[in-house]
């Protein structure tokens, strides 16, 4: 990305990575997108989280959940994306969705809200490695050219929160890459935490009589799918070859 004379770019109605790249001759890898999350802790705290990631990558919410969970003594119950359609938008002051930058001011959080009053700023390594990049200016219809991350005064948590994808190297010590293939889901685990029990007020009392929200999980095995998958991988022209296992 070449140095730009104009720091602000006029990008009317260019709210998506596709739009800004198409209209400004940019590649998604040169753009940093910013997403707002809200984390709810077991102690009722509500954490506004600002995640910056390279435009050609997507966020792995399990990684993000685990990252935030490790930084607080109280357990993280849920993590949700906040956009202009969210009910939680009432806790923000005129946030320009589609034009968010990593330096979004803390004063965008409504002082009357029950949220923490400072952003937890997370930047994925894919974005932090960029020496120059384009991102939102925090003003409607404008994006901004950033010279470096070091020019920003805010504190950032640098972490791996991106979703792995085909073509990624397995490690720095090998040229082997990930291959993506379609499969059949024969079982699943959903770690629901306290997301639903909090809303349903599904509680338990401990030995001391203290109330707590139930920790929930969903564990399933698709019996019919399991048979289907076994047949798909174990057959010949004469029919099914059931595996011994």
Where are these regions (language model features)?
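Extended, low-hydrophobicity, polar/charged segments
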Residues: 1-226, 233, 237-242
